[in-house]
């Protein structure tokens, strides 16, 4: 009995020490967390679960009421081309070069320049705003947890203690708010595993084009429901792409392992050359490395509007404002249209585009001293409901507006996830553009229905095997 009492005292002392360590660690985390618990609670009241302002503007931006999370009855199976849930919607008005000044308050500098560059043909049909953004409940729950635990490294280049949701849904008032917003884009919800066959197209000045068709598989390790922060192994996603056409490029393949902490681990990339039948490391597939299929119109970190390490720019949060951005673009991505219907000289056919007024976060990046990149400045407009970069204005080394990118967003209601259905990269100086993610002429759209194959699938050996098929 006496010896038991001695053991109990030892145990009490042991657990007291352990509890003190745990509490001190929790306190340190809370002090350094993005927001307080009371601020995080706003995600359940005045803010949406992903951090947007829940209420409307009292005029033409409605309140968010849960988004679009149920497919129309006509949508029957995974991978099916999306049925437009709003076929009855018509443009409220159309912005053109002739009336641009009337609406300039709600346009980005890049959009204004597109009107000036193509005054006779570029237009923006403005539709009723529908806040269709939605995500699964478990993503909302993880976003709440991230709000009170996620941190950035002191230089902002690494994300810590986040998993399975937006890391910074409530931006703080520090100098890191801009890079927090950028990390929200980098890690935003895009599904867990997807398979896609799509075309990317470089469109010449005269409108001629030749599609490059690729088959892609992406596993977003950060969004594996069966994972924890400890299980991520510093991996944001795995990406495997195999070129199917044209014949001169067919069989070429790329594999990417994308890290979360890019300060400690650089992106790992491999390329398979079908002609040589060899897999090689591709150490430079980042920053402003040109993408071969884009004919010089897209660089590595242009993909997905922005990706990769943020370390070459100083980022600042400029403001939140209302902007006309591409949204709910079901018609543009419909399989009822051919690429010939869509691709025109200078820009995509505006007859099939849809723009709506949404609130966006404006984030500006200026090139740091003693580093190189073709863009001296980048201005991103992030949709507040999803953290997607919807428009990107990018400047050359002379400070001139050079390139304008737009993501034609829609909600994949079968999951749900709100993401781009097609990205367009405009070179204003060359008067050319490049598109990525076109599926109009493919048998299917993105298929989210299969379980993730796991990290053992995304290997150089698999890259070689897939390239040979």
Residue map of PLM features:
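Bacterial N-terminal signal peptides that target proteins for export
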Residues: 3-19
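Bacterial N-terminal signal peptides
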Residues: 18-27
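Sec/Tat signal peptide C-region and signal peptidase I cleavage site
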Residues: 27-34
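Gly/Pro-enriched, hydrophobic low-complexity segments
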Residues: 34-35, 40-68, 95, 108, ...
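Solvent-exposed N-terminal domain segments of exported/luminal and surface proteins
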Residues: 37, 42-266, 273
């Amino acid at each position: 009995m006496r010896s038991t009492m001695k053991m109990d005292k030892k145990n009490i002392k042991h657990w007291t020490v352990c509890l003190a360590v745990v509490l001190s660690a929790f306190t340190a985390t809370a002090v350094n967390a993005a927001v307080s618990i009371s601020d995080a609670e706003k995600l359940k009241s005045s803010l949406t679960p992903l951090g947007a302002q829940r209420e409307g503007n009292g005029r033409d931006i409605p309140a968010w009421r849960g988004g679009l999370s149920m497919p129309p009855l006509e949508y029957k199976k995974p991978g099916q081309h999306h049925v437009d849930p709003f076929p009855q919607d018509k443009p409220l008005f159309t912005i053109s070069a002739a009336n641009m000044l009337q609406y300039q308050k709600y346009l980005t500098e890049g959009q204004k320049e597109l009107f000036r560059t193509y005054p006779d043909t570029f237009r923006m049909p403005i539709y009723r705003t529908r806040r269709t953004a939605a995500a699964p409940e478990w993503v909302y729950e993880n976003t709440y947890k991230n709000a009170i635990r996620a941190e950035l490294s002191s230089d902002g280049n690494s994300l810590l203690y986040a998993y399975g949701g937006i890391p910074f849904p409530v931006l703080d008032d520090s100098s890191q708010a801009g890079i927090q917003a950028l990390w929200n884009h980098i890690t935003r919800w895009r599904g867990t595993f997807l398979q896609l066959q799509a075309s990317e197209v470089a469109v010449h000045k005269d409108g001629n084009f030749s599609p490059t068709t690729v088959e892609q598989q992406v596993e977003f390790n950060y969004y594996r429901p069966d994972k924890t922060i400890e299980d991520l192994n510093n991996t944001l996603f795995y990406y495997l792409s195999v070129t199917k056409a044209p014949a001169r490029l067919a069989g070429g393949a790329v594999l990417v392992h994308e890290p979360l902490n890019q300060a400690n681990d650089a992106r790992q990339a491999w390329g398979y050359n079908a002609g040589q039948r060899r897999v090689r490391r591709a150490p430079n597939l980042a920053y402003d490395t040109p993408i071969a299929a884009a004919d010089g119109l897209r660089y590595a970190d242009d993909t997905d509007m922005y990706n990769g390490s943020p370390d070459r720019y100083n980022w600042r949060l400029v403001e939140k404002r209302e902007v006309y951005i591409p949204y709910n673009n079901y018609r543009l991505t419909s399989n009822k249209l051919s690429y010939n219907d869509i691709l025109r000289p200078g820009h995509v056919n505006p007859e099939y585009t849809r723009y709506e007024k949404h609130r966006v976060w404006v984030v500006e990046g200026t090139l740091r001293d003693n580093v190189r990149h073709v863009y001296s400045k980048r201005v991103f407009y992030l949709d507040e409901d999803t953290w997607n970069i919807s428009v990107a204005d990018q400047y050359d080394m002379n400070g001139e507006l050079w390139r304008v990118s737009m993501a034609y967003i829609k909600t994949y209601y079968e999951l749900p996830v709100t993401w781009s259905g097609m990205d367009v990269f405009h070179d204003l100086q060359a008067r050319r553009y490049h598109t990525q993610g076109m599926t109009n002429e493919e048998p299917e759209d993105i298929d989210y229905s299969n379980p993730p194959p796991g990290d053992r699938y995304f290997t150089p050996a698999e890259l070689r095997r897939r390239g040979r098929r």
